[in-house]
Amino acid sequence: MTYTWLTVDCDDIRHIPKHHGHPTRTKSPVQSNNLSADFIQGMQGFETWLSSHNKPVTLFVIADSLQSQEFCDWLIDLLKNFADRLTIGCHGLDHKSWSAWPENSDLF
């Protein structure tokens, strides 16, 4: 195996600052935990891409994504199919833009 390390952040539209976690940029919060069509298309493309090579990959998941059964099922399948080279990391609970807020080490 070639030792190339790639990390991928796994953010849906509801996680971007326009919709969540930023004190001035969040204007239209998305209240649903349903996956967006764009995210589902990205999941399918990611899986196709993983099938095209043997390099190790780390996927950083926002923990609240696990509230979607569809996402959980997809992640479980990825881990079954690519267990030898896929690592899952946590990219936070809900993708708050910490650097945009006043310091709060207790909450952080």
Report each predicted region and the residues it spans.
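Catalytic alpha-helical scaffold of carbohydrate-active enzymes acting on polysaccharides/glycoconjugates
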Residues: 1-108
